[in-house]
């Protein structure tokens, strides 16, 4: 029944019958006049009915809407154009636009059925997307084609004039510019690029006017106020323009207007004057003007290639200022390793503070600081270390190196050994200073030299039992591991401590075994150290010395005891590394002397004849020491710096041990005593070992040469390692990778790299590519 009634009334559902009822509601909506709820619902149902029952109803509605919308817009245009003043025109346009744009969201809603019938879109239960509405598109396109296209240039120019006035300090209603921007942004109905109209017009005009403004203002300000004031001006204007851009330009995610504007401002304010600004950098760094440098940094960081010249200036300053300070203090630091390290740390802290305050610890500037500081640390201008290299009996000299690693090792020794310095410091202070050394060590190129000296000092401390703090000693080994020192080196240091601990247990067992035996020397007075040759790396050179009978008789007892517990192992006695305490008695008093085995052997020559004079020649026969070692040992007993009365006297007087002759006579000083505060002490103890090396001259030469030989082997190993992996590689790439592998030990010199490549080619480990002599190929 309902269906037949609907068919019966179909004639009343045509467009012509319904539009007269629909049109007044449409006009009310366009004019933002109120409509009743019933009128609103009727509009929905009438549109639906016409689209459903009138075959051409949808097209007719669309056309009628277009005519009414156009008429409404013409009226709005007339109201806008009635204003001749630019500001008044802007205000009028924005009022009309905002009213119209509000209706762009409301009017399309009742006409959703047009989407289905005209565009074939399927209806959805979801909320319709009004931005894609056919009626909304009609409204925006009509506004664009009529009013906007006619006055957009005036609108745009007026808005830009207001922005220009604001830049000059004049006040105005910012909503006028914002309103124009909103109009540009929302007018485009192109679904592919909804910001096209805005970008092609408003954004372009805004950027162009900004650039014109600063192309005029900036040069004038720079000329009148100078570079340093100009930097403040440029920085202030960039911040000001960014705030303005966030207010006047579109900021939605898919739009990059603000970024484009800032790039434009940077070009006009900074890039154009890049060279002029950068010319001030070097002077600012020298004067430590951190605030001004920070300002320059913030400006140049926005410019392509702006930072690199600043990095170069910083590097040059650190190197020149650092070396100048080192040269100025050369007289002190070359003789005092503590002062040397303090000087290096002072420089590091000074340059680090500059980088922090001026450049906010930017990684690029930290890298520049590190590179330049490394050059200072490794410079060989003030003092240098020359490592000799003997090949086929010919002594050669390698390129001089910085003595820094040796001095760092000496300073570590001062902190770790019982010295006046270590005694006045707490454990925490010693640890802090050692970590400062490790900080400097990070910049040392030839760490293998540090390793050699540090190990030599450690050997001496462990053998003589003169470590200030055994816990810190062992911590130092782990700290060296943490800073990237080679594992094989650190492991050997750890093994040295292990040997000392094992020796303590062995001594205890030896004393227990012989506590009731009568030895030439009581077991309690003997301290044996069994050291692993691989860890301690002692020279194969043995220095023979004729030992006192008491020691000679003890040696077989120790060997027999050791073999019972460790069969198959062989002991090699290193008298050079041994030491002991002897008692000196005379009419003045009784004194304990800490001496080396060589000093002991020399002094025991007088045991049976204390008042006789013995010639150099006879002492050589009695001790069987090599000439050089005997001279060195005698000099330590006749010219010990800390003694006012020496242990031995000699005649005739000479200036150095080299001047002793076969006939030089030596005798025990019967008036020997220890003097303290100008008073003779009847009892006391003195260490005569002093800084005597526990090595021979020849062994030190071997160690120096060993450093170079080890570098050669390490270089060859690294080249083979790279070639095995790469199979084929260019010379430049090979050198780069080689430095990377060896950097924790030493920096290989180009000459050495070239020589080892040639050696490997000669021995057929690698060959040159026939097509390119600078390319190498691995030969399995």
UniProtKB/Swiss-Prot annotation:
GO BP: cerebral cortex radially oriented cell migration; proteasome-mediated ubiquitin-dependent protein catabolic process; protein K11-linked ubiquitination; protein polyubiquitination; protein ubiquitination; radial glia guided migration of Purkinje cell; reelin-mediated signaling pathway; regulation of cytosolic calcium ion concentration
Q: Where in the cell is it found?
A: Nucleus
Phosphothreonine: residues carrying this PTM: 210
Glycyl lysine isopeptide (Lys-Gly) (interchain with G-Cter in NEDD8) cross-link: located at 724
**Which superkingdom, per the lineage?**
Eukaryota
Example GO CC term: the record gives: site of DNA damage
Record PTM: Neddylated; which enhances the ubiquitination activity of ECS complexes and prevents binding of the inhibitor CAND1. Deneddylated via its interaction with the COP9 signalosome (CSN).
| Its job | Core component of multiple cullin-5-RING E3 ubiquitin-protein ligase complexes (ECS complexes, also named CRL5 complexes), which mediate the ubiquitination and subsequent proteasomal degradation of target proteins. Acts a scaffold protein that contributes to catalysis through positioning of the substrate and the ubiquitin-conjugating enzyme. The functional specificity of the E3 ubiquitin-protein ligase complex depends on the variable SOCS box-containing substrate recognition component.
Q: How does it assemble?
A: Component of multiple cullin-5-RING E3 ubiquitin-protein ligase complexes (ECS complexes, also named CRL5 complexes) formed of CUL5, Elongin BC (ELOB and ELOC), RNF7/RBX2 and a variable SOCS box domain-containing protein as substrate-specific recognition component. CUL5-containing ECS complexes specifically contain RNF7/RBX2, and not RBX1, as catalytic subunit. Component of the ECS(ASB2) complex with the substrate recognition component ASB2. Component of the ECS(ASB6) complex with the substrate recognition component ASB6.
Record-given protein name = Cullin-5
Native species: Rattus norvegicus (Rat)
| Gene name tied to this protein | Cul5
């Amino acid at each position: 029944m309902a269906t037949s009634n609907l068919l019966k009334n179909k004639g009343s559902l045509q467009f012509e019958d319904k539009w007269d009822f629909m049109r007044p509601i449409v006009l009310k909506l366009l004019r933002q006049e109120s409509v009743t709820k019933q009128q609103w619902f009727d509009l929905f149902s009438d549109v639906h009915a016409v689209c459903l029952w009138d075959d051409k109803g949808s097209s007719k509605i669309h056309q009628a809407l277009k005519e009414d919308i156009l008429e409404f817009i013409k009226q709005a245009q007339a109201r806008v154009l009635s204003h001749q003043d630019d500001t008044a025109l802007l205000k009028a346009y924005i009022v009309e636009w905002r009213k119209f744009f509000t209706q762009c969201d409301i009017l399309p809603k009742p006409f959703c059925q047009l989407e289905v019938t005209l565009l074939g879109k399927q209806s959805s239960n979801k909320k319709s997307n009004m931005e894609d509405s056919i009626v909304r598109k009609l409204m925006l396109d009509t506004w664009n084609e009529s009013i906007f296209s006619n006055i957009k240039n005036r609108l745009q120019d007026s808005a830009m004039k207001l922005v220009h006035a604001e830049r000059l300090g004049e006040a105005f209603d910012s909503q006028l510019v914002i309103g124009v921007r909103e109009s540009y942004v929302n007018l485009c109905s192109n679904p592919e690029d909804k910001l096209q109209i805005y970008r092609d017009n408003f954004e372009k005009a805004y950027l162009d006017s900004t650039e014109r403004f600063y192309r005029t203002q900036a040069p004038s300000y720079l000329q009148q106020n100078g570079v340093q004031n100009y930097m403040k001006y440029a920085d202030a204007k960039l911040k000001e323009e960014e705030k303005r851009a966030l207010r006047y330009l579109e900021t939605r995610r898919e739009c990059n207007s603000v970024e484009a504007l800032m790039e434009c401002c940077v070009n006009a304010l900074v890039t154009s004057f890049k060279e002029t600004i950068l010319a001030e950098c070097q002077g600012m760094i020298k004067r430590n003007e951190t605030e001004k440098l920070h300002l320059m940094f913030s400006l140049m960081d926005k410019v392509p290639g702006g930072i690199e010249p600043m990095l170069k200036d910083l590097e040059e300053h650190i190197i020149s200022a650092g070396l100048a300070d080192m040269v100025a203090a050369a007289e002190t630091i070359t003789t005092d390793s503590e002062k040397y390290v303090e000087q290096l740390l002072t420089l590091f802290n000074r340059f680090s503070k500059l980088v922090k305050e001026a450049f906010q610890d930017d990684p690029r500037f930290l890298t520049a600081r590190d590179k330049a500081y490394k050059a200072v640390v490794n410079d060989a201008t003030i003092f240098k270390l020359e490592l000799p290299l003997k090949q086929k009996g010919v002594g050669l000299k390698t390129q001089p190196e910085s003595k820094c690693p040796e001095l760092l090792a000496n300073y570590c020794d001062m902190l770790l050994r019982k010295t006046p310095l270590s005694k006045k410091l707490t454990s925490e202070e010693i640890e802090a200073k050692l970590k400062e050394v490790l900080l400097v060590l990070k910049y040392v190129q030839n760490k293998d030299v540090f390793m050699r000296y540090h190990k030599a000092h450690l050997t001496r401390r462990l053998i003589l039992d003169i470590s200030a703090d055994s816990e810190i000693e062992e911590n130092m080994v782990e700290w060296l591991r943490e800073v990237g020192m080679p594992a094989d080196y650190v492991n050997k240091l750890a093994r040295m401590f292990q040997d000392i601990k094992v020796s303590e247990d062995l001594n205890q067992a030896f004393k227990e075994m012989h506590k009731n035996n009568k030895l030439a020397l009581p077991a309690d007075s003997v301290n044996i150290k069994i050291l692993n040759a691989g860890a301690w790396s002692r020279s194969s050179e043995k220095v023979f010395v004729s030992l006192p009978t008491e020691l000679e008789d003890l040696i077989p007892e120790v060997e027999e005891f050791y073999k019972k517990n460790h069969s198959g192992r062989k002991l090699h006695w290193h008298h050079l590394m041994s030491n002991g305490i002897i008692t000196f008695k005379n009419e003045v008093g009784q004194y304990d002397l800490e001496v080396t085995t060589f000093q002991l052997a020399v002094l025991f020559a007088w045991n049976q004849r204390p008042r006789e004079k013995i010639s150099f020649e006879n002492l050589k026969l009695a001790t069987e020491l090599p000439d050089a070692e005997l001279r060195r040992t005698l000099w330590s007993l006749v010219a010990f710096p800390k003694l006012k009365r020496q242990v031995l006297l000699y005649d005739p007087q000479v200036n150095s041990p080299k001047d002793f002759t076969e006939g030089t006579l030596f005798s025990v000083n019967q008036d020997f005593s220890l003097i303290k505060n100008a008073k003779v002490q009847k009892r006391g103890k003195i260490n005569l070992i002093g800084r005597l090396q526990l090595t021979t001259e020849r062994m030190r030469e071997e160690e120096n040469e060993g450093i170079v030989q080890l570098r050669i082997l390490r270089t060859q190993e690294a080249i083979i390692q790279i070639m095995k992996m790469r199979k084929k590689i260019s010379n430049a790439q090979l050198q780069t990778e080689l430095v990377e592998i060896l950097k924790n030990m030493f920096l290989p010199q180009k000459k050495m790299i070239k020589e080892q490549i040639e050696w490997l080619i000669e021995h057929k480990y690698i060959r040159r590519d026939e097509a390119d002599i600078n390319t190498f190929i691995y030969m399995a």
